[in-house]
Each structure stands twice: as C-alpha cells, then as structure tokens.
A protein has these predicted regions:
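RNase H-like, metal-dependent nuclease domains and their acidic two-metal-ion catalytic environment used
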Residues: 1-171
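Conserved motor-coupling elements within RecA-like helicase/translocase cores
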Residues: 179-183
C-alpha cells in the first residue's frame, strides 16, 4: 500500500464504541440465528462503531452489507475478516461507512455461521462471502478440499440473504445450481 495514502486514512480512524460479539442460541444451524444479541466483552472479536438502526415506522431496505474475507484457522494464516457497511448515507451521495468488524482465526464453517449471525443482527443484510479461498485447492491454505458448496448451501438453507453470482444464460438453460459467494 502507498504509505502516504495510509497516513491520510489513519487520521480518520477511531476506536470502536463497543467490543464484544453477537451470539445466538447455538454456533451453527438454525439455532445460530435465533435470539441474536450483542454482548460486550473486552476480549471479543467484533468491534462495533454503530449498532444497527432499525426503525418501526420506516424501513430502509438493503441498508447494511456484510462482507467476508476468508482467511485460515492457524496462527500463521491470514486473518478472516467480516465487515459490515452502512449504506444509508449513499442515498445523499456520500460513501458507505464501516459500522462493525470481526476478525480472527476460525474454522471456515464456523466463520460462515458467525458471518450469518452478524448479517442477520444487522437487519438481515446481504451476506457476501468471498469464495476464492473456499474453492481453492492450494494445500497451503488448509481448506481440506472444496467445502464451499456444502458450507454455503448449509448457510443458504437458513439465511436467505446470501449473495449468489450471476448465472450465464447457458447455466440457466441447464438449470445449473446457483453458485454462492463472491469469486
């Protein structure tokens, strides 16, 4: 990265308002998305600058966007990162802003469920999971084969706001299954 551009960006960095995590009744499956709540914990992996704003008298559709960069589970691997963007001010011509960020080392299937919990907590936001890592066959990445279809379809069965790639006319004609995740 250009160090001068990084220095400019650093001036707008501020500490999170809250640190903790989002929890449901379970860690995976339907229960993971039930009774979600944010719990403050100084050791938590979710940094929150703004909790979700959901108004009863007004609905802002597609306000939040949750994006996942899949890392690895070992300490030597890249960090996995889940970022939530608030796109509300884009209606006024402004830029989206980061309202929450989770980072850590975690098994890929649990990362996907954690991302679904955070996305649901942020008003059922669109969940975009980077699938390059999930679909790679690079032995250095420690993905243990191609689990992407299984993991993303498992999430899709309980969380309907999962990003799917645009299908070609040929795939539609063949009735090929949707490919979830950003590649």
């Amino acid at each position: 990265f250009d160090k001068y551009k990084v220095e400019v960006l650093e001036k707008s960095v501020r500490p999170p308002r809250y640190v903790g995590d989002v929890y449901g009744k379970g860690d995976e499956g339907k229960e993971a998305l039930m009774d979600l709540k944010f719990t403050q914990d100084a050791q938590g992996q979710l940094w929150v600058w703004s909790l979700p704003e959901i108004w009863e008298d007004e609905k802002v559709t597609s306000r939040y966007l949750t994006v996942v960069d899949v890392g690895g589970r070992s300490n030597k691997a890249d960090w996995s990162v889940i970022v939530v963007f608030d796109r509300y001010w884009m209606m006024e011509g402004d830029k989206p802003c980061v309202v929450a960020q989770w980072y850590g080392h975690i098994d890929i299937d649990l990362l996907a469920w954690k991302a679904a919990q955070i996305a649901k907590f942020y008003d059922n936001s669109l969940l975009v999971i980077e699938s390059n890592t999930l679909e790679t066959h690079d032995k250095e990445r420690d993905t243990e084969g191609d689990q992407s279809g299984f993991i993303l379809n498992q999430i899709r069965s309980v969380y309907k706001h999962l990003y799917a790639r645009k299908q070609s006319a040929e795939d539609i004609k063949k009735k090929a299954p949707k490919k979830y995740g950003f590649h």
